[in-house]
């Protein structure tokens, strides 16, 4: 099936509509089910008492040569297994599953082999913050002064100190900083987007080419 790219949300819902079975396992190409998670899933699905409509997986990320065990990155629970008629993907650019039913949090990890290196991560941040800024503009996000100043700082403090990202050494520090940087850039790009949409006097855009 080939079609024009409609965005992450619509594409996700379209893909799910093609499935023929009751349960949907929706994972990215860089995610793997650990043997322990496989057995846990099988145990629940084969149980006669199973009355769940979806399952959250704790996602453990491989980053800069180490497994991240703390901070905002772990456990990063994702609703990845659900009944087809109970779920709908919403939001952009990070499509989120909206479940009409009950979900259970599993204990075993889904393994996430993320960025190849920091250059790969920064490129991904650049791409997704572009899309995030556009979506926030559509949603009418208000004053940006507070967002630019405090949201990135709060995210760093939350991930590195409150959620003990410091226990993961240098990779934990870099993860906390780049998460904070992502937040800063999406609001900075929203500000830039609004400036570009305002009438400019005496500016020759060709000078930047």
Language model regions located:
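Short, acidic/glycine-rich phosphate-metal binding loop used to engage nucleotide
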Residues: 2-8
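Catalytic metal- and UDP-sugar-binding loop of GT-A-like glycosyltransferases, i.e.
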Residues: 3, 27-29
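Catalytic-site signature of metal-activated, phosphate-bearing donor transferases
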Residues: 10-17, 23, 27, 34-196
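Short, low-complexity, charge-dense intrinsically disordered segments
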Residues: 200-209
């Amino acid at each position: 099936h080939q079609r024009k790219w409609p965005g992450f949300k619509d594409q996700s819902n379209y893909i799910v509509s093609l499935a023929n079975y009751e349960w949907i396992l929706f994972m990215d190409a860089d995610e793997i089910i650990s043997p322990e998670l496989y057995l846990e899933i099988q145990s629940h699905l084969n149980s006669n008492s199973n009355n769940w409509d979806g399952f959250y997986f704790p996602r453990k990320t491989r980053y800069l040569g180490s497994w991240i065990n703390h901070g905002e990155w772990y456990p990063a629970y994702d609703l990845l297994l659900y009944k087809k008629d109970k779920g709908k993907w919403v939001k952009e650019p990070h499509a989120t599953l909206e479940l009409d039913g009950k979900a259970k949090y599993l204990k075993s990890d889904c393994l996430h082999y993320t960025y190849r290196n920091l250059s790969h991560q920064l490129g991904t941040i650049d791409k997704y913050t572009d899309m995030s800024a556009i979506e926030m503009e559509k949603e009418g996000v208000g004053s940006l002064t507070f967002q630019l100043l405090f949201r990135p700082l709060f995210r760093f403090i939350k991930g590195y100190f409150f959620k003990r990202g410091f226990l993961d050494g240098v990779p934990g520090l870099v993860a906390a900083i780049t998460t904070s940087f992502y937040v800063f850039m999406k609001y900075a790009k929203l500000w830039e987007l609004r400036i570009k949409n305002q009438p400019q006097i005496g500016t020759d855009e060709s000078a930047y080419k």
